[in-house]
Amino acid sequence: MTSSMYNYIEQTWQSDEWKKVLRQRLIEWRKSPAVERIDKPTRLNRARAIGYKAKQGFVVVRVRVRRGGLNKPRPNSGRRPKRMGVYGYSPAKGYRWIAEEKAARKFPNLEVLGSYYVGEDGMYKYYEIIMVDPNHPVIKSDPNLKWLQDPANRKRVFRGLTSAGKKARGLLKSRGLKGTVKHKWKKKEKEREQKKRHEATKYYRLQNYDKLPGK
């Protein structure tokens, strides 16, 4: 079976030659603004999988997000420095979701369709966001994208309705609830119920031990 063009693009992305090119690009990206509109996607295979099309109404934005723990405002009331909660604050969001929100604030008339990872250095992570203008005539006439005009899909990135938002909320079907707090709670609850049922029949099983088959 013949491999598609996108398969070769994926292989090129993982090659050592591309890593050298990416290193030079990261130097340029660090000097650029945190949210910058670009002409074409860097990873065409990932952009196509999200729904990108090279036509009017689509906008590609590269966003830079700082890595590591974040800082919070220092509280006025007194407490131990350990309990200040100022340094090393970890938000309950992924970097990709934060990048999508930054792009949506920069371009409030556009809706976020999806995003993907493009690179990282010692200080920042870089993502490319695929955005769509829901009021553009070309988008309105597209049967696969006109759902963005529905009022229920406005500001979808701020309500956790994108892929990155659903992943952080534990709602992706492919991911399920595994690894989330709700999954762990359900697992423990199931174990407690099974243990309770097992303990309830313990004395009955001991009394009828001689009557069990093979004993």
Curated annotation (Swiss-Prot):
It comes from the Archaea. Keywords: Ribonucleoprotein, Ribosomal protein. Residues 179-215 are annotated as: Disordered. Pfam families: Ribosomal_L15e. The keyword Ribonucleoprotein applies. Residues 188-202 have a biased composition (Basic and acidic residues). PROSITE patterns: RIBOSOMAL_L15E. GO terms for molecular function: RNA binding; structural constituent of ribosome. Signal peptide: none annotated. One of its GO terms (cellular component) is cytosolic large ribosomal subunit. One of its GO terms (biological process) is cytoplasmic translation. SMART domains: Ribosomal_L15e. HAMAP family: Ribosomal_eL15. Belongs to the eukaryotic ribosomal protein eL15 family. This is Large ribosomal subunit protein eL15. It comes from Sulfurisphaera tokodaii (strain DSM 16993 / JCM 10545 / NBRC 100140 / 7). The lineage of its organism: Archaea, Thermoproteota, Thermoprotei, Sulfolobales, Sulfolobaceae.
